[in-house]
A protein has these predicted regions:
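N-terminal leader/targeting and accessory segments in enzymes
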Residues: 1-99
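Walker A (P-loop) phosphate-binding motif
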Residues: 12, 97, 101-116
Length: 116
């Protein structure tokens, strides 16, 4: 069973990161309602806002309210206020790498490119 099953609203903690942005773009394009938060303004945040995504700066516990699923960056500390609030509310929380795998399963074929 996919962690996306039955989910409509997905909140991304650390949405300004280069690892989160492609996942956000794909899920937004697939019709999911996306919200996000980060600590700093930046080009990615501006682009997400231009896509119609609600982005909260800085992190705020109430930003996760209404989400069906929370995705967090590896850069997010375990005591992050949004992550803690999501757990209090019983909202499923997954790390970005798990969501990347889920997104790959949405397509019949995937290609991975890596390097240093």
């Amino acid at each position: 069973m996919s962690i996306l099953e039955g989910k409509k609203v997905i909140h991304f903690i650390g949405c300004g990161g280069s690892g989160m942005f492609p996942i956000i773009q794909i899920l937004h394009g697939k019709g999911y309602t996306i919200t996000g938060s980060d600590v700093n303004e930046g080009d990615i945040i501006n682009y997400e806002r231009n896509m119609g995504i609600k982005v909260t700066l800085p992190h705020a516990a109430e930003a996760v309210e209404g989400a069906d699923l929370v995705v967090y960056s590896a850069a997010i500390f375990k005591d992050n206020c949004e992550l803690a609030r999501a757990k209090e509310l019983g909202i499923p929380c997954v790390e970005r790498s798990i969501m990347l795998g889920e997104v790959c399963r949405l397509f019949p074929k995937s290609i991975c490119v890596s390097g240093t």
